[in-house]
């Protein structure tokens, strides 16, 4: 019954009166990032994208990213050159590209891509690790027409493990945020970015969208074990309550998944 309703709804918006039905997938996910400089395309990072199924009837949303992905070598061997060839075939010269993909039986099944920076701000991690800032490159390109003079480009095999913890919140008015200074002082935390502050409202229409993201914390550590310890401490430190005293945070990432 749900399928029939969804099919009729989709058909009503189709000028061609055809509906594309995709296979529903629940596989693990990865995100990939490319930089295009004067027609040359370079893979700069590949990370695991972890999502949480914590709300009924909406798509799962990200709760963490981990770099580098254990799937990187396999991707470089089997798919990277084909992806670069595809980008070149459509004339991409300069810019930032991201790809989101499922990983099924060791193979990437791509479902989304964009020709821009991402809202996940992963460039903060790559900038810390390899010193090249994609945001600054785009600003420079906008002002001068040239992305960079740097001869050494980022290498996707990060020499340190890195993570982006993403906190999701329920709709409501934010009353109080605790733990910020404790998180800033943790070893390896390089930045944290709030999308809402105390007194602001997360609307009901945000449910099931990235508008539920309230905080991102960026961490670079010397070892994977140190990274996990810092991530756990971040989760323990942060508290966000509504004006009525309700805990607004949705279930967070479990570092045992790393």
Show which residues each predicted segment covers.
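Rossmann-like NAD(P)H-binding beta-loop-alpha module
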Residues: 1-45
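Generic secondary-structure signature for well-ordered alpha-helical cores
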Residues: 8-15, 37, 51-52, 88-92, ...
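Generic preference for hydrophobic
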Residues: 21, 43-46, 110, 192, ...
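A short glycine-rich, hydrophobically flanked beta-strand micro-motif that places a catalytic Asp/Glu
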Residues: 22, 93-105, 150, 249-254
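ATP-dependent carboxylate/phosphate-activation module, predominantly the ATP-grasp catalytic core
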Residues: 23-26, 34-92, 96, 103, ...
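A short, glycine/Asx- and small/polar-enriched loop/turn
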Residues: 103-109, 208-211
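Peripheral (often C-terminal) accessory segments that flank ATP-dependent C-N-forming ligase machineries
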Residues: 139-258
